[in-house]
Amino acid sequence: MLKDKTAYRVAVVGATGAVGAEMIEILEERKFPVEALFPLASARSAGGTVLFQGQDVIVEELTNDSFKGIDIALFSAGADVSRQYAPIAAKAGAVVIDNSSAWRMDKDVPLVVPEVNPHDVEHHQNIIANPNCSTIQMVVALKPLHDRVRIKRIVVTTFQAVSGTGKDAMDELMDECRDLLSFRAAEPKVYPYQIAFNCLPHIDDFLPSGYTKEEMKMVNETRKIMGDASIQVTATTVRVPVYVGHSEAVNIETEHKITANEARALLSIAPGVILYDDPEHKIYPMPLDVAGQDEVYVGRIREDESIPNGLNLWVVADNLRKGAATNAVQIAELLVR
C-alpha cells in the first residue's frame, strides 16, 4: 500500500515534453516525497538529462521493463503510449496517473480533479485519469455553484493556448510572429493554418456531428467528474495565439436562483479558486496573470439577463500546471495521504 511508505519511486513518462517537464518541476515545488525519480521518454530523447532537486537525472528509454519497482507513474506522452504502457505499469504494481485521453471515459478508471471529486481516487485499479486541461479549470470553478444550486446546462467557449498542443506549437507561434513581422510568409506545420495573429476554431479532429473531439471531451468529462449525467453541456473550443493560459467564457443555467454576489461569495472560499473580479477597477483574469500559478482564476461574474436562473463567468488557468501537471501531482498526493 502506498500509504504505508514515506517516500516513493516515481516514473515520469514523457519527461522531456512540456507537461512532463512541468510534472518534474511541480514534484519538487510541492515537496512530494520522492525516493527516486525515473524520467522516461522515447529512444530519440533518451540519454539526455532533467534537473531534479539540484541533480541531473538521466532520461531512460521507455520499455516494457521500465516499471519494475515503481510506485507511481505519471504519464504525459499521448494516448497511444498510454494505451500501450499504462496496463504494463499497472500490472507491475505502479499506480498510473495518466494525462492523456486514453482512459478518461473508461468506466473502471476514475477521472479526478482533487478539488471536485477526490473520493473517486479510492476506486482505482492502478490507473487514474487526469482530465482534459479545459475541463479541469471549468469544473473547479463550477463545482461550488453546482453544490449550492445545481447546474442544469453549461455553454462554454474556450480560448486555448498553443502550449496545449506542445513544444512544437509554441515554437511555431514564435517563428510565425518573427516571420510575419519581418514581412515573410508564415509556414504552418503544426496547425492547418497560421496561428500567429489568428484564431482557429478547430482543436483535435472533427466528428460527423460537426463538433470536435476536444469539444466532446468537455461534454463527457464534465458529467463524469461532477457525477451528474443529466447536466447538459455544449462547447466550442478555439486555439488562440497565446503561449500559456487557457481562458473560458462560461454560461450556466441553474435549477435555483443564484445572484452574482452569492456566486462571488461561494467562489471566494472555494478550494483552488482565486476570485479576481472587480470590473470597475479593470480587474479580471487574463492568461498573463495565471502563467506559473496553480489556481483557477474567476472573474466577470454577472447574471444572464436572458433567462431567470443564469450566470456568466470568465475562467482562466495555466493549462500546463493546473490543467495538467499540477492536477496529476495533486492526485498523487491524495494517494499517499
Regions found by a protein language model. Give the residues of each.
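N-terminal Rossmann-like NAD(P) cofactor-binding subdomain of oxidoreductases
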Residues: 1-195, 230-232, 282, 296-297, ...
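Charged docking surfaces used in two-component/phosphorelay signaling
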Residues: 73, 162-337
